[in-house]
Swiss-Prot record:
Residues 257-283, 459-478 are annotated as: Disordered. Keywords: Cell membrane, Glycoprotein, Host-virus interaction, Ion transport, Membrane, Phosphate transport, Phosphoprotein, Receptor, Sodium, Sodium transport, Symport, Transmembrane, Transmembrane helix, Transport. The lineage of its organism: Eukaryota, Metazoa, Chordata, Craniata, Vertebrata. Glycans are attached at N81. It is a multi-pass membrane protein. The modification Phosphoserine is found at S253, S256, S259, S268, S316, S385. This is Sodium-dependent phosphate transporter 2. It comes from Mus musculus (Mouse).
């Protein structure tokens, strides 16, 4: 059959297929490296480089198997023997419908399944072309079942693996010995699965024809060799690296404590007073410790029964003009000791501190229902108010702690400063001099917005004896120690590469499956499609996926790596390994499972095991709803394009 008249459709199909691959890369590749970026083991740029390599390799070696299911397993192509041009138009429609919906979802940062898109689009054009008889409904039922099986299976495998790791490694007082013993096993399992997948699916591409037992034997042998290499070289190197890191952190901690102790001894007798400060000025604002006045504090604490007073501050601000100390130099404070053992400082109302703290410290007014104290943090142990003020102006984060029990003023939220989330550049600043304070004020004035807010600020900085509520069992969240982070750092990178490889093999079919069908129909002049999937078409799809990742991938990486649940290297390793294992198995048996479903199932399962409240269930609900919405929406887009193309092809045929 002469197909030259439909060359325009093939050209259009290639263009749309690249756009579809672009959308797959922008949306689905986040499943592979999202957790690695979220746990901090790789940067976004490093993730893009690694994903580009492994996505392309996986698409070439594994993509042919699933591509056959996409292009021949969902619809009965034999019904189009007499109307080949209709099937070609349908393949173009399927790509358009899938690409449009995935681009919209990527723009909205909504992670959806590329498999859902292409399946729904294929069904949509078939219903328009020849009605419901063109759809192989039993195949569709199997695919729909896999949408539920894949997250459950992946989540179950991830959960079991994480429980074992937590039991034998994470909960140990010294996790290093058990972790080092398990490293060869972890690496061997990852390599074995990967090698088996390549040889089983990619053997025709490599020119090999081996029985399955031979492939399994080779995979097992390669895994043993790799495990021996890890045990012989990687484990001793990792042990030295962990010991060096711990020794360095211990030395830094000792030096920091010694430095703070010396400064505290030198500055504790009193506070400096700046020129222009008038303690008797009625415009001054008291700055005081509320450690003994907070709700829940004992009477003994208020009476000063502790051997040393806890230094904190409470800043009560009222509406009024504020001027920078750079312009008028009217910043001052003076310490006053009351008989309750607390130190009271006075801050001039017209000083720059008023304005700067007003704009730099944000009060969470939505926490009135929970006045109890959060975890204790110590910002600094020093009595130097310059240090506190400069740190606050530079943007120390604030967490709500308790409400002041001051009956003379309206109840307002109180907060404490937390110093564990400040950028490295901010930590390097000096906070203990007047010049550093003035520099911070000058920078803050440039960034500050005009306006005023009434607030009361309190921060507890130094009292380790203050009672605090332990988090409930549901609120507890396990965090990796420094040595555990190092143990699983490289493992998560390896499993992320493995997941990217599996993703390339599974999801390249979503973009290239219809294009392969379109190309084979045009080349052979029929719908039989007996030829194997061309490798260069798989490579073409891999390039499109990588392009989408570099341009738009970071939008969904944020959702998968950070928003759904916090990720650590240990939990990220289990998520990556179990979900990738599920995807590779599905790819090898030709079942187009969704990598999104596998990864979401693993993330939710491990996050729920780590902490009952660590999972963003609202986001999970939205993703779950999107799984159902994608198929009909993509089908509607495809059906509309199919109707348009059939109209155009009808005009074209009549004109000939």
């Amino acid at each position: 059959m002469a197909m030259d008249g439909y060359l325009w459709m093939v050209i259009l199909g290639f263009i749309i297929a690249f756009i579809l691959a672009f959308s797959v890369g922008a949306n689905d590749v986040a499943n592979s490296f999202g957790t690695a970026v979220g746990s901090g083991v790789v940067t976004l740029r490093q993730a893009c480089i690694l994903a580009s390599i492994f996505e392309t390799t996986g698409s070439v070696l594994l993509g042919a198997k699933v591509g056959e299911t996409i292009r021949k397993g969902i619809i009965d192509v034999n019904l189009y023997n007499e109307t080949v041009e209709t099937l070609m138009a349908g393949e173009v429609s399927a790509m358009v419908g899938s690409a449009v919906w995935q681009l919209i979802a990527s723009f909205l940062r909504l992670p959806i399944s590329g498999t859902h898109c292409i399946v729904g689009s294929t069904i949509g054009f078939s219903l328009v072309a020849i009605g419901p008889k063109g759809v192989q409904w039993m195949e569709l039922v199997k695919i729909v079942a896999s949408w539920f099986i894949s997250p459950l299976l992946s989540g179950f495998m991830s959960g079991v693996l994480f429980i074992l790791i937590r039991m034998f490694i994470l909960t140990k007082e010294d996790p290093v010995p058990n972790g080092l013993q398990a490293l060869p096993l972890f690496y061997a399992a990852t390599i074995a699965i990967n090698v088996f997948s390549i040889m089983y699916t990619g053997a025709p591409v490599l020119g090999l024809s081996l029985p399955i037992w031979a492939i399994a034997l080779i995979s097992f042998g390669v895994a043993l060799l790799f495990a021996f290499f890890v045990w012989l070289f990687v484990c001793p190197w990792m042990k030295r690296k962990i010991a060096g890191r711990l020794e360095k952190e211990s030395a830094l901690s000792r030096a920091s404590d010694e430095s703070l102790r010396k400064v505290q001894e030198a500055e504790s007798p009193g506070f400096k007073e700046l020129p222009g400060a008038k303690p008797s000025d009625d415009s001054a604002v008291p700055l005081t410790s509320l450690a003994g006045e907070a709700v829940g504090a004992s009477e003994g604490t208020s009476a000063g029964n502790h051997p040393r007073a806890s230094y904190g501050r409470a800043l009560s601000m009222t509406h009024g003009s504020a001027k920078s100390p750079i312009s008028n130099g009217t910043f001052g404070f003076e310490g006053h000791m009351r008989n309750d053992g607390h130190v009271y400082h006075t801050v001039h109302k017209d000083s720059g501190l008023y304005k700067d703290l007003l704009h730099k410290i944000h009060v969470d007014r939505g926490s009135e229902e929970k006045p109890t104290q959060e975890n204790n943090y110590r910002l600094l142990r020093r009595n130097n108010s310059y240090t506190c003020y400069t740190a606050a102006i530079c943007g120390m984060p604030v967490h709500t702690t308790f409400r002041a029990s001051d009956t003379s003023s309206a109840p307002e939220d109180s907060e404490k400063l937390v110093g564990d989330s400040v950028s490295y550049s901010k930590k390097r600043l000096r906070y203990d001099s007047y010049s550093s304070y003035c520099n911070a004020v000058a920078e803050a004035e440039i960034e500050a917005e005009e306006g005023g807010v009434e607030m009361r600020l309190a921060s507890e900085l130094a009292d380790p004896d203050r009672p605090h509520e332990d988090p409930t069992e549901e609120e507890k969240e396990e965090k990796d120690s420094a040595e555990v982070h190092l143990l699983f750092h490289f493992l998560q990178v390896l499993t992320a590469c493995f997941g990217s490889f599996a993703h390339g093999g599974n999801d390249v079919s979503n973009a290239i499956g219809p294009l392969v069908a379109l190309w084979l129909i045009y080349q052979q002049g029929g719908v039989t499609q007996e030829a194997a999937t061309p490798v260069w078409l798989l490579f073409y799809g891999g390039v499109g996926i990588c392009t989408g990742l570099w341009v738009w991938g970071r939008r969904v990486i944020q959702t998968m790596g950070k928003d759904l649940t916090p990720i650590t290297p240990s939990s990220g390793f289990t998520i990556e390994l179990a979900s990738a294992f599920t995807v590779v198995i599905a790819s090898n048996i030709g079942l187009p499972v969704s990598t999104t479903h596998c990864k979401v199932g693993s993330v939710v399962a491990v996050g729920w095991i780590r902490s009952r409240k660590a999972v963003d269930w609202r986001l999970f609900r939205n993703i779950f709803v999107a799984w159902f919405v994608t198929v009909p929406v993509a089908g509607l887009f495809s059906a509309a394009i199919m109707a348009l193309l059939m109209y155009i092809c009808g005009l074209f045929s009549s004109s000939r």
